[in-house]
UniProtKB/Swiss-Prot annotation:
This is Bifunctional purine biosynthesis protein PurH. Its EC number is 2.1.2.3, 3.5.4.10. One of its GO terms (biological process) is 'de novo' IMP biosynthetic process. Keywords: Acetylation, Hydrolase, Multifunctional enzyme, Purine biosynthesis, Transferase. The IMP cyclohydrolase activity resides in the N-terminal region. The modification N6-acetyllysine is found at K287. The keyword Methyltransferase does not apply. The keyword Cell membrane does not apply. SMART domains: AICARFT_IMPCHas, MGS. CDD domains: IMPCH. GO terms for cellular component: cytosol. InterPro entries: AICAR_Tfase_dup_dom_sf (IPR024051), Cytidine_deaminase-like (IPR016193), MGS-like_dom (IPR011607), MGS-like_dom_sf (IPR036914), PurH-like (IPR002695). PROSITE patterns: MGS.
Length: 529
């Protein structure tokens, strides 16, 4: 099998035209003949490039509003023709060999994401000719290079320059794999979109449509291999979604430190998603996927100091997330005080990075600023299947709370209640969070009975010498019995925020009244397993 194949003729037909003019200019300057279609051909001609319209080459016009452009034997014969084997038949039918195909597909995902997108709009943005050319070229990668990503343009030109206008087989094979991945992802988007509309076509309500497709197709791109997974005997890799805009651990840039481990990524995600809940300067410290300290304040330095005081023992070797730029003073406080695995923030000052550089093992991630959190899906793998649900983006404001006890909360109790309610959303169930003056003072996580989570939160606060009297307590789900309220009262809690909804709500409310506790119902649960 010939390793090198010269590129003498290229067919360019792209929806996303970023970089295509420069790439075409580079190809033309190296003697490559250009074929093109529709808008791509017009753009190249406007830029003064010598380009042949595919319709002129085939002798067959584009038709049906562009639905039929490249579906022609002179196009696909030129792509699929096996060099040295099909030469005679290609010559007989005046089929020119096409050595490179540059294609990206109609923007189906962007179209269906637009508000008010109709079924007709979606249908017209299903590319037919593009995927057909992509698959043809990828199949014949022995002779043809297929380019579906503009990020590959520069590398292709460099390789051609290094190989007298040719591309190596290894490169053509790699490009073919990218092409098959590209068409697989494209078809998956289409199948998912139309699959979600099946209920509507069976006469079900509009609410039934647009939710979950009949068949779920997922495409993720491998970002990195890892030394091991959750445990050292497990192999692992990190895959990310393409074109994610929201600030996340997947899109963050690592500016220093060792490679992230499986557990680092999971814990950093938990910390970052929690800190996003707060508008004020905030710090979240996470250990084993649970917050062990959270605080908001006027500065991230004070927020860090207060979050750390919740549970210094658990903070050792933890993950620290901020929702403001990491400054030098805060970086110095962290490095001087504790061992930390990861620090993640929207940005970091030069002075802060100079300080963290003294501890090269500390991983520092910059995630960028975030706007509104985007809806999406959460997945949980079970043996033989996958649980899928909407992301938990539920929030509750003060105006939505219901006071169900005789006593109303004070302004500070209410602030603390809303604060610890946000934290409880990110604590493993059963979750109990004690908070006072905008900082956590005790967190009980992951217990099988809610009362023990309440007791553990009280123990944590006592161990650190933090005063519970006058604090607020959040519970991620309702109290099935009054014992959790009794435990909180014994610790000194004076305000409770919880979803409500237990068959024993009256008993629980009565317990709160007995202890003089103000109780707020959110009517929203935040289980986290």
């Amino acid at each position: 099998m010939q390793q090198r194949r010269p590129v003498r003729r290229a067919l360019l037909s792209v929806s996303d035209k970023a970089g295509i003019v420069e790439f075409a200019q580079a190809l033309s300057a190296r003697g490559v003949e250009l074929l093109s279609t529709g808008g791509t051909a017009r753009l190249l001609a406007e830029k003064g490039l010598p380009v042949t319209e595919v319709s002129d080459y085939t002798g067959f016009p584009e038709m049906m509003d562009g639905r039929v452009k490249t579906l022609h034997p002179k196009v696909h014969g030129g792509i699929l023709g096996r060099r040295g084997l099909d030469d005679a038949i290609m010559e007989e039918h005046q089929i020119l060999p096409i050595d490179m195909v540059v294609v990206n597909l109609y923007p189906f995902a962007q179209t269906v994401a637009r508000e008010g997108c109709s079924l007709e709009d979606a249908v017209e943005n299903i590319d037919i000719g593009g995927p057909t050319m992509v698959r043809s070229a990828a199949k014949n990668h022995k002779d043809v290079a297929i380019v579906v990503k503009s990020s590959d343009y520069d590398a292709i030109i460099k390789e051609m320059d290094a190989n007298e206008g040719s591309l190596m087989l290894a490169t053509r094979f790699d490009l073919a794999i990218k092409a098959f991945e590209h068409t697989a992802a494209y078809d998956s988007m289409i199948a998912n979109y139309f699959g979600s509309m099946v209920p509507a076509y069976h006469g079900e309500s509009k609410e039934a449509a647009g939710r979950f497709p009949r068949t779920l197709n997922l495409n993720f791109i491998k970002k990195q291999d890892m030394r091991y997974g959750e445990n050292s005997h497990q192999q692992a890799a990190f895959y990310i979604e393409e074109n994610v805009k929201e600030a996340s651990v997947a899109t963050a840039t690592q500016v220093q430190g060792k490679a992230l481990s499986y557990n680092n990524i999971a814990d950093t995600d938990a910390a970052l998603e929690c800190v996003k809940e707060f508008a004020e300067p905030a710090c979240v410290i996470v250990k084993h996927a649970n917050p062990c300290g959270v605080a908001v304040s006027n500065s991230i330095l004070d927020a860090y100091d207060r979050a750390y005081k919740t549970d210094p023992t658990s903070a050792f070797g933890g993950i620290i997330a901020f929702n403001r730029e990491l400054d030098a003073e805060t970086a110095q406080a962290i490095i001087s005080r504790q061992f930390v695995e990861v620090i993640i923030a929207p940005s970091a000052s030069e002075e802060a990075l100079k300080i963290t550089a003294a501890k090269q093992n500390v991983r520092v991630l910059i995630c960028g600023q975030w706007g509104e959190r985007a809806p999406g899906l959460d997945f949980k793998r079970v043996n033989g299947g996958l649980l899928v649900q909407d992301r938990d983006l539920g929030i509750v404001g003060a105006e939505e709370l219901r006071v169900v006890t005789k006593r109303q909360p004070t302004e500070q109790e209410l602030r603390d209640a809303l604060f610890c309610w946000k934290v409880a959303k990110f604590v493993k169930s059963n979750a109990i969070v004690y908070a006072k003056n905008n900082m956590t003072i005790g967190i009980g996580a992951g217990q099988m009975s809610r009362v023990y989570s309440a007791k553990i939160a009280g123990i944590k606060a006592a161990d650190e010498g933090l005063e519970v009297k006058g604090s607020s307590m959040a519970s991620d789900a309702f109290f099935p019995f009054r014992d959790g309220i009794d435990a909180a009262a014994a610790a000194g809690v004076t305000c409770v925020i919880q979803p409500g909804g237990s068959i024993r709500d009256d008993e629980v409310i009565a317990a709160a009244d007995e202890h003089g506790i103000a109780m707020l119902f959110t009517d929203m649960r935040h289980f986290r397993h």
